[in-house]
Amino acid sequence: LFRDILRRRLERGPVLKRLREEFFKAATEILDPDEFLLALRRDIEKLNNYVLIISPFLNKTTVEKFCNLREVDKALREGKKIVVVTRPARVPEVEDPGEHALCTRILRDHGIKVIEKEKFHFKAVIIDDSIIYVGSINPLQIVTVRYIPADYMLRFVSEALVDEITERFIPEYQDWLKGSA
């Protein structure tokens, strides 16, 4: 009996592996900083309910640019929720507390909910429980004017992956989405 089960599994193994590989090729993108920003804009444009941006560090230029995107403006005017999770504006959490505090104020002034969380380095964007970006790019800090850093984001279209990551690594996720800016 065990040998039969093992034999059937080995026969199916390569087929399942190929299916998994094809699925992930279709549902996954590897994005450099410029590609990430373009993909994020497209996703915000199609936003149904919310976008959660987890960016430990903030840059004034990047935050202002984000707040002034037509896609962000449209989403907010339509009552969709944009939530940013970042570190508190104090040393040792951030290098420049003054700039960081200014960034959080700019976000709030635009109607974006800001949540401060200490001591985290995770970077991600979650859209409508179905799209997740994870990687090394701080979404609201990255600046690509002088050079493109060797950072990346992986974009997955997978409700199951969003569930898995939020349950295992972001237990506060549902609380962050409650309430308004």
Residue ranges, per PLM feature:
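Short beta-strand scaffold segments in enzyme catalytic cores
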Residues: 123-126
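Primarily the HKD phosphodiesterase
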Residues: 36, 40-109
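Conserved catalytic or regulatory cores that recognize and/or transform ribose-phosphate-containing ligands
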Residues: 120
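Signature of lipid phosphatidyltransferase scaffolds
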Residues: 1-17, 132-181
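Acidic/glycine-enriched edge-of-secondary-structure segments
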Residues: 14-34, 49-60
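General small-molecule cofactor/ligand-binding pocket signal
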Residues: 112-117
